[in-house]
Amino acid sequence: MKKGKILALAGVALLATGVLAACSNSTSNSSNSSSSGADQVFNYIYEVDPENLNYLISSKAATTDLTANLIDGLLENDNYGNLVPSMAEDWTVSKDGLTYTYTLRKDAKWYTSDGEEYADVKAQDFVAGLKYAADNKSETLYLVQSSIKGLDDYVNGKTKDFSSVGVKAVDDHTVQYTLNEPESFWNSKTTMGILYPVNEEFLKSKGDKFAQSADPTSLLYNGPFLLKSITSKSSIEFAKNPNYWDKDNVHVSDVKLTYFDGQDQGKPAEQFAKGALSAARLAPTSATFSKVEKEFKDNIVYTPQDSTSYLVGVNIDRQAYNHTAKSSDAQKSSTKKALMNKDFRQALSFAFDRTAYASQVNGKEGATKMLRNLYIPPTFVQADGKSFGELVKEKVASYGDEWKDVNFDDAQDGLYNKEKAKAEFAKAKKALQEEGVEFPIHLDMPVDQTATAKVQRVQSLKQSIESSLGTDNVVVDIHQMKTDDVLNITYYAASAAEEDWDISDNVGWSPDYQDPSTYLEIIKPGGENTKTFLGFDGKENAAAEQVGLKEYAKLVDEAAAEKTDVNKRYEKYATAQAWLTDSALLIPTTSRTGRPVLTKIVPFTAPFAWSGAKGRDMASYKYLKLQDKAVTAKEYQKAQEKWNKERAESNKKAQEELEKHVK
């Protein structure tokens, strides 16, 4: 059997082995010298308070961006994107790709928030973590429920015996997982919180007080930092764990995050200039930006685009109307019927000027640098030498002429087209009038009133859609609301019944692991995120069936069933993405990064990852180094060129070494 076939069956893969060569990120290695002597403190901002610190349960970035710095799992990402040892000092996978065995390091400990040693980290802690997640219906169960043998039966109550689930502590320092099918991306899942350990004794002692958002003592820590304090809408502070097993790779002594409500867009740059922040996102549309440009003309750096995709979601099953401009049931019914019509949704997508939208954040010159035209980034994976975006372009063309000349590359607006918008709307209007729909269609869109750039973005969206389609046809009704009120009807809504909007740009996704399924699985009927993305929940939903999501789910399942041929697998996922693109149920807008910043982070020293929780830009602090002065654009470019070359070599070497893990 050829080595390549063994590795495919064994289910091991790097970050898609060279697939990402066309992409880079703002985090990793550099030759720049960092400041020395005094302790380094990383000062930055945060924008959303965490609901809790429960890394085993929460899928919210507001939680995981914090806990990934406090808790270590089996593996983590280095500054080149390789998966390297963390709690596991070594691992093996069986030749059939079904059994992963991890050998834990013996110097790993649990510590209290005061830094006092509590216990050794043992294999049973990983078993306890998964059991707790299953028993408490973790928001991230979708990551592993169908992967780990017996877990689905346990979650669905077919068995109450957790020992039948494919995770076991072979001994104190060996944990083993048995999968249902090979997964080439399994190891990348180990960076996610649901597969982190928890000390069972501590967990029981805390009960329902475990992992409370404002209580650092409600957690144990085995990671690089200890949480010192959280004050809602004020600050979050970490301190370096002085006894951490890998403390030599923790270069900052403290992390201090200050709450930013987004109202004064120029404030981060002002704080950076005063030395109060280590890095600052810039707002080219702010009144003070010309001053920033003058003072830091050589230091403005645009971070490369990452794998986080932001979108406009369409609520296909709205139930709440506490925040609406609609004055009658007829208007509510008309909007619902319009949003169920694919031609109408496509008209919205083609009518939306994303460049103008992004310019509210990046300014006119930098607007295109953050644009995204596909839910899954076009370079996320490739098959037979073609990027994922190229595969989708080929497949979506079969849905209609409107797609034949669309460019899905990043950093340009391949979708905005007034003529196409009008043509699709004309088709939609004819069909909707036959259904008795009243025009104009009113679309309620909530926005945080304190976040100036967010308000300006949705105002831009309103302007371009209404300009393209006419206010006699479509009116976007913007609802400016308090921060918590917006979050409670979008991001933090407990159920679809509380999703009180027609269209929303409070929608985004960062991939959990290195496979297209991480994007596509979550919006199948029954998926955890259908309420936030599309306004419905449950597997059997009439609206979801009406818009064709059962067909979509079938395409995703067909791709997931391809376990041995990666090229065929990605081709099939491209087919599913093509269906989703044509449906216009999700309208892509931007990536998370691709924005202008000022920074004292030594370029490319922080961990890098296209997926998982251990390499988020500006949110992963292990490895990160600081320098005394702001990085110049010239320094950054030189460091990036060096890092790209080193990363390619490092990834290649890591890929070659995978064979030794197959036993």
Curated annotation (Swiss-Prot):
Any one GO molecular function term: peptide transmembrane transporter activity
InterPro entries: Peptide/Ni-bd (IPR030678), SBP_5 (IPR039424), SBP_5_CS (IPR023765), SBP_5_dom (IPR000914)
Cystine pairings recorded for this chain: none
SUPFAM superfamilies xref list: Periplasmic binding protein-like II (SSF53850)
Signal peptide: 1-22
Lipid-attached positions, N-palmitoyl cysteine: 23
Region annotated Disordered, chain positions: 637-663
Gene Ontology BP, a term: protein transport
Pfam family, one: SBP_bac_5
Gene3D superfamilies linked to this entry: Dipeptide-binding Protein, Domain 1 (3.90.76.10), Dipeptide-binding Protein, Domain 3 (3.10.105.10), Periplasmic binding protein-like II (3.40.190.10)
Segments traversing the membrane: none
Topology versus the membrane: Lipid-anchor
Function as written in the Swiss-Prot or TrEMBL entry: May be involved in the expression of cell surface properties important for colonization of the human oral cavity. It may also be involved in uptake processes.
PANTHER family linked to this entry: PERIPLASMIC BINDING COMPONENT OF ABC TRANSPORTER, PERIPLASMIC OLIGOPEPTIDE-BINDING PROTEIN-RELATED
Name of protein: Oligopeptide-binding protein SarA
Organism, as annotated: Streptococcus gordonii (strain Challis / ATCC 35105 / BCRC 15272 / CH1 / DL1 / V288)
